[in-house]
Amino acid sequence: MRRGQNGVALITVLLVVAVVTIVCAGLIIRQQLAIRSSANQLHVRQAWHYALGGERLAEAVLRRDLRQGGENTREPVDHLGEAWARPMTPFKLDDGGELRVRIEDPSGRFNLNGLVRKRKVKPDSVKQFRRLLATLGMKEEIVQGLPDRLADWLDADQNPQGEQGAEDNQYLLEAPAYRAANRSFKDVSELRLLKLSEADYRRLLPFVSALPEDAPLNVNTASVPVLAAMFEIDPGQAENIVDARGREGFQSKDDFTKHLTQLGSKTGNVSYAVGTRYFQVISEVSLGDRRQVLVSTLQRGKDGKIRVMARDMGQGGLPIPSTGGDDWKKDER
């Protein structure tokens, strides 16, 4: 009888030890997960503040650029030879990470919101966008269909443009269903909603922007495809413009107009300038095993005040934009 009791006691002790071991192991695992989670949260917060630091640095560079160019200049000039447009040296961080900052001019791209004026479609702008797609070598169905779908996305009505336009009745058939925005783009990523593949979206991305509809094109930073599309000239003539402006750019709208006239073309109804009010700052932070990208859209006033129009933490980094010459042909299909 006593042997049986001893056996039960031994089993009970072993069971208790096993339970305690399992509980302790669970506590240790939970503690490790909590520590790892805290470290990740710390890295996220650190990366966010480092990225904001990159944005502040860009603001300082842009203010200095305006001072050097003269705040009272009637026609401010912004070109690719200025300090803001040059690659910045990566900044080493105390935690072993790295901060990279790049400033771009979205006014040198085709403004998608420019297809409408007061929510009404501008046929000339639709044609310009179609020429851009053709110049980039996009598929014919995209060249013909995307401009109409974009116009429908931006305008106020529910009447499809052309044969390949799309309004709510088409998008409600998608899975999941959605509606046309009938407003301006807040971000160029909305193009993905217009039945555009990821590969085609990436191909188009360096050449388009989503600025206020009245934002003029900066001819000093525009690429060959954009210049060709906007001013209805062939790519060879657009390359001639890029060569003529050089690194210092055109110093006035008249300079650009004269050169365009020499090529046998006119500015037409294109709204253009030799400077810009808008800048895009890409702050990329590498910290530990994390990589964080902050894309900030800034507006710089003539008085040097800078306003943050938008911040986007959801980007995986933006491609280096095409700035002219033959580099835009590399991915041409």
From Swiss-Prot:
Subcellular localization(s) per the UniProt record: Cell inner membrane
A Pfam family annotated for this UniProt entry: T2SSK
Any one Gene Ontology BP term: protein secretion by the type II secretion system
Domain of life according to the entry: Bacteria
Free-text description of this protein's post-translational modifications in UniProt: Cleaved by prepilin peptidase.
Keywords: Cell inner membrane, Cell membrane, Membrane, Protein transport, Transmembrane, Transmembrane helix, Transport
Residue stretches spanning the membrane: 8-29
Main location: membrane
Region feature Disordered, mapped onto this chain: 313-333
Propeptide, residue positions: 1-7
Topological region Periplasmic: 30-333
CC terms in the record's Gene Ontology section: plasma membrane; type II protein secretion system complex
Effect of residue 7 to V: Complete loss of secretion
Summary of the function given for this chain in its UniProt record: Component of the type II secretion system required for the energy-dependent secretion of extracellular factors such as proteases and toxins from the periplasm. Plays a role in pseudopilus assembly and seems to control its length. Interacts with the pseudopilus tip complex that is critical for the recognition and binding of secretion substrates. Type II pseudopilus confers increased bacterial adhesive capabilities.
Assembly: Type II secretion is composed of four main components: the outer membrane complex, the inner membrane complex, the cytoplasmic secretion ATPase and the periplasm-spanning pseudopilus. Interacts with the tip of the type II pseudopilus subunits XcpV, XcpU and XcpW. Interacts with core component XcpT.
Family (UniProt): Belongs to the GSP K family.
The protein's name: Type II secretion system protein K
Organism in which the protein naturally occurs: Pseudomonas aeruginosa (strain ATCC 15692 / DSM 22644 / CIP 104116 / JCM 14847 / LMG 12228 / 1C / PRS 101 / PAO1)
Lineage: Bacteria, Pseudomonadati, Pseudomonadota, Gammaproteobacteria, Pseudomonadales
Gene expressing this chain: xcpX
